C-alpha cells in the first residue's frame, strides 16, 4: 500500500516525481518492501507527459473518453484540449497516430478495469496497475468538470506555456521510458473488457497481502506503516482532485500549493516507523501538517462555497472555475458527481480533525499503534481497519453543519451505489470508500447494529436500558472509537429526519422505539395507573425464570389501591383486558365474588376466556375463581375458548381442571367447537385430556361429523385414529385379561370416555339393535377400563383399584361378573333406546380416565 499511495501521488504531481521516488525508496528500506519505485514513478508520469508535450497546438487531443465499433472500424471518443464536452467527436484510430500516448493511456485504463475481476484470486499486485487505476478514476471524475469557459482556457494555456523547460524534459524522458515497458502488459490484458469492480477491492487485497507477507516481528513496523499509508492516501486524494481540474490550468494550481504538500508528505515518509524517532520531527511535522491542512481546506471550501453562502478563494480565477465546476456537476447528476462531493467532504473532515487535534504527535502515534495492535488480534481474517474508519466517530463530532444541504442532494445517488455495487464488500473496504462526510446513513447503520444483539446481551432489560447507548463487545472489536460514535449517533438521531431517506429514518426510529417501550411507562385510559414492565406482551427473552413464574402466579407486582374498585369496574376491566386494574382490585382488601354471573350467566373467567386474556385468566384462577361455571345454555369457559380458537387459553383452562365433556343445551362440546373451527392443535389437546369423541349432539352428530363438515382432513384423521386406538387397546386388554378364552363378536355401543375428575356419575343413551341370529353360548358384557393417556399412547387395565360402585341399565342394577372386582358387569340391553348410569367414586383430583364399552362375547 506504500507503493499504491506513492504511485498515486506521483501521478497527480509529475513535477516532483524524481524527489518522491527517492523518498519512497527510503521508506521502503525501513519496512522491507523494495523495488519498482523508479519504474512506478516513470509510469505515473507518463499519463501527463503525452498530453502536455504539444502545448502550443490548439487542436491537441486532451484524452480519449470512450470507444465503440461501427462498421468494422474502431472509433474513439476524443476530448479536444481547450474545448468542452459538447465538442467531443468520434475519430477513427488512424486519426490518432500522432497521439499514441493518449491512446495508450486509454487502453491501459480499459485493461485495468478489465483486469480487476481476473485478479481477484491473485495475491501479488503489480504497482503500475494501481497507478493507472488512480489515473482512470480521476479521468472519469474529471469528465464532469470540463465546463469552464473558453476564455479561461486560453488564460490557463498562456500560463501553461510559461512552464519551465526542465520539468517538460523530465516528463518526456519518463514518458519515453514507460512506452517500451508497458506495451507487452497492455496487449496481454486487452482481451476481455469488464467494467465491474472499483479500486477498493485491490486496495483491500493489497492490505491482506502486506499482512501475510510480513514477519511477525515486524508487527509494530506494519502498524505505524498503516498510519503513514492513511496520511499519504489523504494527500493522494487531494492530488487526484487536482487532476480532475481541466488540464490547461493544472500547472497554475499545482504551483500554488503542491510544493507545500510535497514537503509535508516527505516529512511523513521520512518519519521513522519506530516510536522513539517520532519525537525528532515533531515540530516540523506539525508545521507541515497545518500547511497541508490549510491548502486542502481552501480547495474544499471553494467547492462547497456556492451552497453555503461563503467564498474563500485562493485567487479570483480559481474561485470562478470552482463555481463553474459545481454548476456543471449539478446539471449532470451522475454517480461521479456524488463521488466528487464525497471526496471533498472526506478531505475537509480529515483536515478539520488534524487541525483541531492538540495531542502531541508521539502520543497520537502510540495510541494508534495500540489500537492497530488490538484490531490485529481481534480481527485475524480481515485487514486492519484504516485510520479514517477508526476515527470516524470523532470526525462526525467535528462535522460542520453547513454541509447538510449538499448532503441532501447527494444522498440518493450515494445510497444507490452503495447498495447495488458494494453489497458484498468487507466492512473495512466500506469504511475506506464510503463517504466520511455522509454521516447519516452510517449512523442509521450503527443504529441498526444496536438491535442485532444476541439473546445473552438482551437477557436483562434494565441493564440493556442503562447501557443502551453503548455498543456491544462484538462491535468494539471492529472499531476502537465506535462506542463514542454510537453514543453520538443516538443523541443526534432525532435530527436525522431532514438528512436521510424516509424509509431509513422510520426503520431506525421504529426499532429504537420498540426497545424503548419495553420498560417505558404509559398511562392507561383512566390516566391513573401505569402499565407494568411485565405487561400483557411478555418479553420472554429478557424475563428470568423466577420472574416468569411469579408472573404466572400473579405475584410479580403488588399495588396498593388508593380507592376501592367497584365490582362493575372490575368486570369492565376483565372484559377490556385491563390487567393493572384487575390486579390492583384483586390485591386489595376488597372482597369480590369472582363467580358472580351477569344477566347472561357469564362469569369473570368466561369473560377472560372469551377474550383470550390469558394473563387475566391466570390471575383469576390464582385468586380462586372457578373454571367450570356454566351459563344458562350450558356454555363453559372452555367452550368459549375453543369456539374463539384460543389455543393457549384452552391449555390454561385444561391445566386448571376444566371439564372437557360438558355439553351445551344443544349437546355440543368443546371438542365439537374445535372441530368446527378446524383447529387441530386444540382438538389434539382436548383428546389427550380425555375428551369423549363419541358424544352425540342434540341432532345426533358426533365430533367426526363436524370435522368432516369443516372439510379439515387433519382433524378428521386425528379423531379417527384416536377412536381406532381406543378400540384396539380395549380389545387387546380384554384378550389379555381372559387369556384368549373369550372371543369378541361385536360392540354394542361405541366406546365412551369419562374423566373421573369430572364427577362421580356417568350416563349415556344408546340404541341397541339385536342381531337376527344370536350365536349360541354368547352374551353381552360391560367393560369399564381404567386408562391413562400418555400423548397418543393409551394404557388400559381391568384390574387393580377400581372406582366403580354401581351400574344401572334402564333403572335395573347390573351385577359384576367377579365379586372382588367391579371392572366387568353383566349387561342386558333391550332392543331400541337404552339408558345407562354408572355410579363412581368421588375423586376430583384423579387423572384416570374410564373407557366404557359393551361387547357381545362368546366363550371358547
From Swiss-Prot:
Effect after changing residue 80 to A: Abolishes interaction with histone H3K9me3 and prevents recruitment of the HUSH complex to heterochromatin. Impaired ability to mediate silencing of unintegrated retroviral DNA
Region (Disordered): 129-191, 206-440, 458-496
Modification after translation, per record: Phosphorylated in M (mitotic) phase. Phosphorylation by CDK1 promotes dissociation from chromatin.
UniProt entry keywords in alphabetical sequence: Acetylation, ANK repeat, Chromosome, Nucleus, Phosphoprotein, Repeat, Repressor, Transcription, Transcription regulation
InterPro entries, A to Z: Ankyrin_rpt, Ankyrin_rpt-contain_sf, Chromo-like_dom_sf, Chromo/chromo_shadow_dom, Chromo_domain, Chromodomain_CS, Dendritic_Spine_Reg/Scaffold
Stretches forming ANK repeats: 600-629, 633-662, 666-695, 699-728
Superkingdom as given in the UniProt entry: Eukaryota
Any single biological process term in GO: constitutive heterochromatin formation
Biased composition (Low complexity): 259-268
Assembly mode: Homodimer. Interacts (via chromo domain) with histone H3K9me3. Has the highest affinity for H3K9me3, and lesser affinity for H3K9me2 and H3K9me1. Component of the HUSH complex; at least composed of TASOR, PPHLN1 and MPHOSPH8. Interacts with DNMT3, EHMT1 and SETDB1. Interacts with MORC2; the interaction associateS MORC2 with the HUSH complex which recruits MORC2 to heterochromatic loci. Interacts with ZNF638; leading to recruitment of the HUSH complex to unintegrated retroviral DNA. Interacts with TASOR. Interacts with humanin.
Name this polypeptide is given: M-phase phosphoprotein 8
Organism of derivation: Homo sapiens
Gene for this chain: MPHOSPH8
